[in-house]
């Protein structure tokens, strides 16, 4: 990339790191088929770490009883709307936080995937067949940068299972080869934990030997506390993709620090519009008690900005160091892996879809198929079309100027998915950005430097 990689001296960044919260921040995504127990487990974890008080638990427990859904009260903690609680289905993405002694966790999008599987007879099978969500969720998580996966086999206390080792092994035997094919390193980066989300067995405290004599491994919390998350660079240039914004006595941008250090009082640039703003306040939570001087990579932040209006910032923008901005482009070259194209026979130049890149969602068109990549890695130039599960190099254009990075420079900011008619049809990585796309931001950086 034409831009310098680092910002400030190592000593300066080390000083800032000393001021930041020393606990690693881990973002966790709960994935899995409908009714596998994702919300129940999330609710149980919030409860066990004291992030939800007894009063809230009692309120939801009463509400669940009134609706004849007594076993669902933990899920109610994560179900945000009245409509969802009535149906007993979680539709919105629940955002909640909990802490242990060594880590701060946010249940959102994600360094770590918790794939929740139902051990109940028939439910695992329904989730794992072609129309179930287990496969797509696991594949999507991998694409979106989830390297570490914890497979939680839930409902082990259910009457068709009764903590039987055979059922746990059967599920692992079927799922493991699929995860391996999806690109997970199943030896190093996939962990298997049997639990009961509803009773809390093996979530924080180990399951009793009377109930389950064969499992001698760690609890879910023990696994989560010891996972090693790499790839975060506090010494790199500042990169904060904007997830949302709102007005609360000033403009507040929400996002996650992907690289560099975000410092209260510093100047930042908003891409793609090139506006300069001042960081008036940084919070790593929603309350006044969460105000910090410095946020580091992995932190979810609420940034109060001075010098910009509501209309100057939106989802998909990026907050960067003005001296080291990211490229902004409407065209790029990518390596693309197609998934199942059930709804279309072939994939050709001219194909339109919605591109999801970091927090941005933009309409895009495939302008040219440059080469088909064979299973042996060999390339066939200028293919006329592609079919399901083939890979290619292609040129893509967007309707809007969008901040982006090459995958080789910033994996999280150079990885994307293409969606069409509500389904993911391809996963890709940005391999080339036109040199001209760097020019405008370089000019703005030069002006700022004067």
Where are the regions a protein language model picked out?
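Alpha-helical scaffold elements adjacent to nucleotide-binding pockets in ATP/GTP-utilizing enzyme cores
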Residues: 41-45, 56-59, 136-140, 167-178, ...
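Conserved Switch II/interswitch segment of TRAFAC-class P-loop GTPases
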Residues: 103-136, 142-169
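C-terminal effector/interaction modules appended to NTPase cores
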Residues: 1-28, 33-36, 87, 100-101, ...
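P-loop NTPase switch module centered on the Walker A-proximal segment
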Residues: 6-8, 18-108, 113-116, 120
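Conserved nucleotide-binding/hydrolysis micro-motifs of P-loop NTPases
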Residues: 51, 119-123, 155-160, 197-201, ...
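Residue-level signature of catalytic and energy-coupling elements of molecular machines
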Residues: 35, 41, 60, 86-88, ...
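Canonical P-loop GTPase G-domain recognition
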Residues: 147, 158-237, 241-243
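Short coil/turn segments at secondary-structure boundaries
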Residues: 127-129, 164, 205-207, 368, ...
């Amino acid at each position: 990339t034409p831009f310098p990689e680092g910002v400030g001296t190592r000593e300066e960044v080390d000083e800032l790191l000393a001021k930041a919260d020393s606990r690693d921040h881990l973002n966790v995504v709960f994935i899995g088929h409908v009714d596998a127990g994702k919300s129940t487990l999330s609710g149980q974890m919030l409860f066990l770490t004291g992030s939800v008080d007894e009063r809230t638990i009692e309120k939801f427990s009463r509400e669940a009883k009134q609706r004849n859904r007594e076993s669902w009260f933990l899920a109610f903690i994560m179900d945000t709307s009245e409509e969802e609680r009535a149906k007993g289905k979680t539709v919105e993405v629940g955002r909640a936080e909990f802490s242990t002694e060594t880590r701060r966790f946010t249940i959102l999008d994600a360094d770590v995937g918790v794939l929740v599987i139902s051990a109940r007879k028939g439910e695992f099978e329904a989730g794992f067949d072609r129309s179930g969500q287990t496969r797509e969720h696991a594949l999507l998580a991998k694409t979106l940068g989830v390297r570490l996966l914890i497979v939680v086999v839930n409902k082990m206390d259910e009457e068709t299972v009764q903590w039987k080792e055979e059922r746990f092994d059967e599920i692992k035997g079927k799922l493991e080869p699929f995860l391996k094919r999806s690109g997970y390193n199943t030896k190093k980066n996939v962990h298997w934990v049997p639990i009961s989300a509803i009773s809390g067995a093996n979530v924080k405290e180990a399951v009793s030997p009377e109930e389950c004599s064969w499992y001698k491994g760690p609890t879910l919390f023990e696994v989560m506390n010891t996972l090693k998350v790499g790839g975060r660079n506090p010494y790199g240039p500042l990169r904060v993709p904007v997830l949302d914004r709102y007005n609360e006595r000033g403009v507040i941008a929400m996002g996650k620090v992907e690289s560099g250090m975000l410092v209260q009082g510093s100047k930042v640039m908003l891409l793609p519009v090139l506006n300069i703003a001042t960081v008036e306040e940084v919070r790593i939570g929603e309350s006044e008690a969460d105000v910090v001087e410095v946020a580091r990579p992995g932190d979810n932040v609420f940034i109060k900005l001075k010098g910009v209006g509501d209309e100057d910032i939106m989802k998909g923008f990026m907050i960067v160091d003005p001296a080291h901005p990211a490229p902004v482009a409407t065209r790029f070259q990518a390596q693309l892996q197609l998934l199942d194209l059930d709804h279309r026979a072939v994939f050709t130049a001219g194909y339109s879809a919605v591109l999801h890149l970091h927090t941005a969602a933009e309409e895009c068109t495939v302008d040219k198929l440059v080469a088909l990549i064979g299973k042996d890695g060999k390339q066939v130039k200028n293919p006329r079309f592609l079919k399901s599960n083939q890979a290619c190099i292609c040129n893509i254009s967007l309707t809007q100027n969008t901040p982006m990075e090459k995958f080789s420079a910033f994996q999280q900011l150079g990885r994307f998915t293409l969606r069409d008619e509500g389904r993911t049809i391809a996963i890709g990585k940005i391999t080339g950005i036109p040199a001209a796309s760097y020019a405008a931001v370089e000019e703005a950086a030069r002006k700022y430097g004067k």
